[in-house]
Curated annotation (Swiss-Prot):
This is ATP-dependent Clp protease ATP-binding subunit ClpC1. The keyword Iron does not apply. GO terms for cellular component: cytoplasm. ATP binds at residues 553-560, 617-626. Residues 80-144 are annotated as: Repeat 2.
Amino acid sequence: MFERFTDRARRVVVLAQEEARMLNHNYIGTEHILLGLIHEGEGVAAKSLESLGISLEGVRSQVEEIIGQGQQAPSGHIPFTPRAKKVLELSLREALQLGHNYIGTEHILLGLIREGEGVAAQVLVKLGAELTRVRQQVIQLLSGYQGKEAAEAGTGGRGGESGNPSTSLVLDQFGRNLTAAAMEGKLDPVIGREKEIERVMQVLSRRTKNNPVLIGEPGVGKTAVVEGLAQAIVHGEVPETLKDKQLYTLDLGSLVAGSRYRGDFEERLKKVLKEINTRGDIILFIDELHTLVGAGAAEGAIDAASILKPKLARGELQTIGATTLDEYRKYIEKDAALERRFQPVQVGEPTVEHTIEILKGLRDRYEAHHRVSITDSAMVAAATLADRYINDRFLPDKAIDLIDEAGARMRIRRMTAPPDLREFDEKIADARREKESAIDAQDFEKAAALRDKEKQLVAQRAEREKQWRSGDLDVVAEVDDEQIAEVLGNWTGIPVFKLTEEETTRLLRMEEELHKRIIGQEDAVKAVSKAIRRTRAGLKDPKRPSGSFIFAGPSGVGKTELSKALANFLFGDDDALIQIDMGEFHDRFTASRLFGAPPGYVGYEEGGQLTEKVRRKPFSVVLFDEIEKAHQEIYNSLLQVLEDGRLTDGQGRTVDFKNTVLIFTSNLGTSDISKAVGLGFSQGGSENNYERMKQKVHDELKKHFRPEFLNRIDDIIVFHQLTQDEIIQMVDLMIGRVSNQLKTKDMALELSDKAKALLAKRGFDPVLGARPLRRTIQREIEDQLSEKILFEEIGPGQLVTVDVEGWDGEGQGEDAKFTFSGGPKRAETAEPDLAGAGAAGAPTAGTE
């Protein structure tokens, strides 16, 4: 039975329990149910009794006079009396007789009257309300104007008190009176939108087809336009044709809810329309207008849109709709008969300046709610940062959300107790435990000392809490632009907070930081550093990516590694790099894997490898490795990314690349030169070799890529070949990694200069660059070290020194051997300058 109770009926039962507790009664009788019905205040029962002059205080005094108060407040569950149970059973019977499939407050009141012998009935009679008269009043309210059967409310149906309950019962159940809410000051102020509100008024004032539909993207303020109209009606700022109108918003969900049988939904909607037609002063607002299409339609039934069409065409029903562009196109435009009955009113996204004005108008509401002060700079930051960095939502909604969450964040921080209060709690708990242990051990002297210590700690804690509450809580917290930026950073992962002195210094020293992992390549490091500084200072073109580069040059000189180092510098993690191997996209049809498959193709729901990653990480470094191996169609798709900073994926969503750094690596034009030039250890002529290689690379790039692609790239950087000194520095980096691994085993590693030079000789190939160096170190150093550790020739606490035998520093040293000797570890072993960086970064620093 209770599953049929409406929310209000359930609330009546809860209130009846509360009334029983207040009177110290250990049961719930009919009198408590009557008190609950009146206390609920909004249902049909409460309105019926109120119209008969029955008040809560009057009933309560009569109950106390008849029964009196109990001696002791009951604890636990309070049971119903048999008579109260009978009333609830009778309420079900009354509902069925009226043809209702729910039990509301009106049915419970009718059950009380039908029972007729309980304390509740006696109280009503004493207060001058004859039971038959009460019943008639309930039936009259249920029947409305025409005296027909009650409008079904459906479980969870909404209602609210209004000035004339008998004439707006159905609308109150299925909607909300916006003009009443505006009169009570419950609606947020509407800033701007005068043109849209005026256009809505014009359409509403037409003779026929006077139904505007607000069309716009989600979050631009379509509902706010309707709320602005409601406020204009209340303030009398409307033409004569709209004065004294009541604006109701219709809840289609409550209309459909509980309509179990065919015809239930249509009957409810007809009653709503009949009430609107009878009153003649109602304007209906239907949010999410597209839900009308198909709403309530079942086998043999017609949907809500078909029921409304005749009235909309004749001007008998004034309706304001609101829906998004996509939903309007998908649902409304397909139904031409429905579309022509509505006049579209476009609601565009406000500008940043307009959004700031909107935020200023809403400031008081959010300050009162969060108990904070919101500065002007916070509102400017919310509008500008939201517009720039949140691209899948619209102003002013996203800016308002930033302000709201920043206020909530500040309030939560202020309401959280400081750490020293928790420390006091822990100390007090420890003192109590020690005191109890001392008492158990009958060490009463120690227990007395601990008791005094506990009292002292409690007093200190109370004083500290008083300081916190009187100091921190009395001062109104301030939400400024930094708070807004922090919230945005949490949302998007974009570090848009103000440049601190530490961050500024780090950016100015960016080249130095990158060179901890990248050996040489001054041109490339400078170009990338300038692009990042330009972005962080806010001077880059807001429509283009933060930077776009082609890294060209021989294999194994650090092109990919620089991309990883950049991602590590920005995010502290190499995994922040979005790396795409373009060798996987050499066929025409594989381009769909990158940007998302079109509808009807395999993988449509999964999205593209590039677009999905950038949507989730809008502030990232994107590396297109070996771009020359990709199909030509992919270059065409990337033109829009390079120029406008955006790309449409297979599902029609716009992906934003404005906060990404795009890096393309290429080996074009370097293979022949690498073979001819070799390592380039001789300093003389190395610059000429580089210029020849650079010219060759540029020529090859122009042959392979279209001019419109190369023209959109910020910079083409040709990497230098590595010199002997740079190769030795790379040895330091890689050996530093091995040394750090040995540190975990309490061992240290040291290489002689001759050993480093021999590793550089054996580990560098003029064609493959520095990549073979990793394999050389693995073969010559790591393999032998691992054997010696397993044979226990080297153990914890030792310093392993690596030297070379049989090589005088000349030639390739084919017969030379590396020697390993173990000795006591020094207190502070001097590590190579760059060893730490090698451990922090990728294992093969300086290589791709």
